[in-house]
Amino acid sequence: MPSLAELTKSLSIAFENGDYAACEKLLPPIKIELIKNNLLIPDLSIQNDIYLNDLMITKRILEVGALASIQTFNFDSFENYFNQLKPYYFSNNHKLSESDKKSKLISLYLLNLLSQNNTTKFHSELQYLDKHIKNLEDDSLLSYPIKLDRWLMEGSYQKAWDLLQSGSQNISEFDSFTDILKSAIRDEIAKNTELSYDFLPLSNIKALLFFNNEKETEKFALERNWPIVNSKVYFNNQSKEKADYEDEMMHEEDQKTNIIEKAMDYAISIENIV
């Protein structure tokens, strides 16, 4: 069995190389060793420089675990790692509480809650953070999920969409939640549209739901069982049946007109013969 130091070194190399699957394999035996050495859960009553230094290393291990979990879309694992980091990040020990990854991981945790539509816990956590971190929104990373939540609550979907489209401030881990949150925005707009309209032109739906083309819009409409008739999207069967009936009536009128025209042509031809 490799030592804790050897396992930690292998973890660091795997993470730097972007081998997140290897990170996930290394982390369980590392956590076992941390538990054996009373390091996984910090005992802040121990005021020993060596122990505190070991806790700093443990914090970095947990941060790697959290970030690797995001990269592999293992959000349950990410949440577990973040909860294990909380005693460090919100410790009274300044050295333990500081980290260059702290703002990023807190933001990812808040985005994870938003992606689950867990707004109650999101706002509860926000209140907790507000007590422990001054001027939350002055931090460019922390302000990202806060703005997103505010605009979603206000129904300012264009602003929320633009923020998601902005490339998540070049934080690649944020992109793990982008598609989920975009889908949530589309679903919310779709629900409101269904309640407000009987039908809308396909081109309007494309613009409303931020689609790039009508083919994507048609696919979305069919997934929601929205009938499409003559480039119009219908949101209830009654409206669709009415559209079908009107379409059928127009077709019958065209047929009648065609028959009458043929009859008139025939009558004129007979008259000319006589």
UniProtKB/Swiss-Prot annotation:
<keyword id="KW-0647">Proteasome</keyword>
<comment type="function">
    <text>Acts as a regulatory subunit of the 26S proteasome which is involved in the ATP-dependent degradation of ubiquitinated proteins. Necessary for activation of the CDC28 kinase.</text>
</comment>
<feature type="domain" description="PCI">
    <location>
        <begin position="76"/>
        <end position="251"/>
    </location>
</feature>
<dbReference type="GO" id="GO:0006511">
    <property type="term" value="P:ubiquitin-dependent protein catabolic process"/>
</dbReference>
<dbReference type="GO" id="GO:0034515">
    <property type="term" value="C:proteasome storage granule"/>
</dbReference>
<protein>
    <recommendedName>
        <fullName>26S proteasome regulatory subunit RPN12</fullName>
    </recommendedName>
</protein>
<comment type="similarity">
    <text>Belongs to the proteasome subunit S14 family.</text>
</comment>
<dbReference type="GO" id="GO:0043161">
    <property type="term" value="P:proteasome-mediated ubiquitin-dependent protein catabolic process"/>
</dbReference>
<dbReference type="GO" id="GO:0005634">
    <property type="term" value="C:nucleus"/>
</dbReference>
<dbReference type="InterPro" id="IPR006746">
    <property type="entry name" value="26S_Psome_Rpn12"/>
</dbReference>
<dbReference type="InterPro" id="IPR000717">
    <property type="entry name" value="PCI_dom"/>
</dbReference>
<dbReference type="GO" id="GO:0008541">
    <property type="term" value="C:proteasome regulatory particle, lid subcomplex"/>
</dbReference>
<dbReference type="GO" id="GO:0000502">
    <property type="term" value="C:proteasome complex"/>
</dbReference>
<dbReference type="InterPro" id="IPR033464">
    <property type="entry name" value="CSN8_PSD8_EIF3K"/>
</dbReference>
<dbReference type="Pfam" id="PF10075">
    <property type="entry name" value="CSN8_PSD8_EIF3K"/>
</dbReference>
